[in-house]
């Protein structure tokens, strides 16, 4: 606070602007003017000093006590100066009623201010409560309707998942049956191919046998033709010999009787038929043994093939079941991952909401703490003001008790020097501002020549309030108030 000229204030109690580091500047002052008693006294009087003005012995007006103002200034040093002027005042009035009335008025003003601050505090608390009640439903919306729809959708999803699993199981069963039928078909095809291969082998053997039979028949036919040729040749030779010899020679040949060729052939047939039968039986036996071996091999191979096919079918079934289980596990994993992502998103949203709620509550708590600290500081300041007022009351009471009636006025000039008080906890400096006390001309019936002419000086009180934060001036407020000083004129 910068002061220019006379730094007294005649305005009533008005708090200055609230700022972050400057608390309220409270001013408690009395009304302008003094009580009637022959002198008109201004309220600009230095605190703690009694100013007297010289009078003639014949002119002794009744002195009146003038109320002094109290200024509460926070974080400012008050400096008071007047252009090298000596102030003259009057003596102390010992009227106890007027003094007590003044003190009662000041105490009533103080109590009125305390009640006003309490009302403001209650209004602020009610506003804070209303704001918190208003913000609660916004921060905590009702999701019950959404929960019901979510539950219905989850039930539908579960039903569709069950239906899908049932259809998948049916598809798997049909695939398994199709695989079984395909395996049976392949087995039948393989058996058919084996039978066809066996029939082809038998056909080849039959062809070989038919070829052998044809060869034998050709040999028999050739032998028959040779036999006929031999017979014909023999007949021709006999005929030729008979023709050469004629009928002259009778040659008797005692030869063995000619064998019957049919009989010989029959005998040969009888000899060869058992051999052929034995050979045929051997061949048939060999063929049957080969066929039995082949059949046994076919049966064993078919059994092995069936076993292998059964194993393959079982392995395919196990593979299909494992694939179905794997797909089910994959679907379950995907569903669990989707549920996990949904839950993470939901809980992250909830966490963000809760974090925002916590931040809002922390901000509100910080504001409430700041308000409480500010109110605590104001309360401490008011308590300090109360203690100062009590001290002043005690000093006034002691002064009233020490004064025994009216005292004579002793002329004395006093320099305006402020007497500062000690600072309170919040850094506010409480000082009694200087008040310039002067008297109007003597109001007695007989004018006193010793009073002399009086002059009125107009002094402007300029009060500048600055709000400083981080070494920078944020806002500034200037209040100018005029003040009249009455002093004897120079002759």
Swiss-Prot record:
Residue stretches making up the IF rod domain: 96-407
Coil 1B as annotated region, ranges: 143-243
Tissue: Expressed in skin and scalp. In the hair follicle, it is present in the upper hair cuticle and the upper cortex. Also present in the in the upper portion of beard hairs (at protein level).
Cysteines engaged in disulfide bonds, as pairs: none
Chain spans, region Head: 1-96
SUPFAM superfamilies, A to Z: Intermediate filament protein, coiled coil region
Location of the region described as Linker 1 in the Swiss-Prot/TrEMBL record: 132-142
Alphabetic keyword roster: Coiled coil, Intermediate filament, Keratin
GO cellular component: cytoskeleton; cytosol; intermediate filament
Site positions for Stutter: 345
Start and end residues of each stretch annotated as Coil 1A: 97-131
Region (Tail): 404-491
InterPro entries from the UniProt entry: IF_conserved, IF_rod_dom, Keratin_I
Coiled coil listed as a keyword: yes
Function field: May play a role in late hair differentiation.
PANTHER family recorded: INTERMEDIATE FILAMENT (PTHR23239), KERATIN, TYPE I CYTOSKELETAL 39 (PTHR23239:SF106)
Family to which the UniProt record says this protein belongs: Belongs to the intermediate filament family.
Something else known: There are two types of cytoskeletal and microfibrillar keratin, I (acidic) and II (neutral to basic) (40-55 and 56-70 kDa, respectively).
Oligomeric and partner information: Heterotetramer of two type I and two type II keratins.
Name of protein: Keratin, type I cytoskeletal 39
Organism encoding this protein: Homo sapiens
Taxonomic lineage from the root: Eukaryota, Metazoa, Chordata, Craniata, Vertebrata
